[in-house]
A protein has these predicted regions:
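Intrinsically disordered, low-complexity terminal regions
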Residues: 1-242
């Protein structure tokens, strides 16, 4: 399918696999392996639609130009995106999501892990059972899991994280604000040097470990970060990292 400057692909399948690969500029190619006779691929403007009415398994491979918008709705299909995309939205009952980079990210799953190298803009991920692991988040993020770990290598925007029974780790926090909650997990945060920390933290049966004060001869702070943490039976550790 030849497409214009704002292409998108919407995929609906009950089970199977969805794979997005790098393709040629201005061209979207879709290959479908399914026994569902109602499954079809259609086009509406620059939007390519691939779905079936009766459910069933379908393995869908998309070759698309970079920064295309991808939307997937599935009951139990894994989603793998190997090329940078613009907006990535995935709604599933169970299934893992793996991606390279996305301009914006939104995922919702009852059971599944989310892994990606980076999100340039906003990210919103909700899963009942599964880890959330993302390299770099460039803007605001809202991440929630009931029984999984949340691991972010770097966040440059406001970050809100909640986990009932998992650990929360932010390798380097440079955004202005972090709100973190966990019932039976710990929180570990890295902050850059020359950061003024505004901390509001509480834990019922855990420990709080903070970096040493810079001292009177230290250089003035370059940024201020507000951190609010609520824990029940977990530890909080904050380190200074380069």
């Amino acid at each position: 399918f030849p497409v214009g400057d704002s292409p998108s692909v919407k995929i609906g399948t009950r089970s199977g696999r969805v794979r997005v690969e790098a393709g040629e500029p201005g061209i979207v190619r879709i290959q479908v392996d399914t026994r569902n006779p109602t499954f079809e691929v259609t086009r509406r403007g620059d939007a390519i639609l691939a779905s079936g009415e009766r459910g069933g398994r379908a393995d869908v491979t998309v070759q698309a130009p970079s920064m295309i918008d991808i939307e997937v709705s599935t009951a139990s299909a894994d989603v793998e995106v190997l090329t940078p995309v613009g907006r990535l939205e995935v709604a599933s009952a169970s299934g893992d999501v793996a991606f390279d980079t996305a301009g914006r990210l939104q995922t919702k799953s009852a059971s599944g892990t989310v892994r990606g190298n980076g999100v340039e803009g906003e990210a919103r991920c909700i899963t009942a059972s599964g880890d959330i692991r993302i390299g770099v988040i460039g803007d605001r993020a809202d991440l929630s899991t009931a029984s999984g770990d949340v691991v972010i290598e770097q966040c440059r925007g406001e970050l809100s994280v909640a986990s009932l029974s998992g650990d929360i780790r932010v390798g380097q926090l440079t955004g202005p604000e972090l709100n973190a909650k966990s019932v039976s997990g710990g929180v570990r945060i890295g902050i850059p040097p020359r950061t003024r920390l505004d901390l509001d933290a509480s834990t019922l049966s855990g420990k709080v470990s903070l970096p040493p004060s810079p001292g009177p001869s230290a250089e003035p702070p370059e940024r201020e970060i507000s951190v609010k943490v609520r824990l029940v039976s977990g530890n909080l550790r904050i380190d200074r990292v380069d």
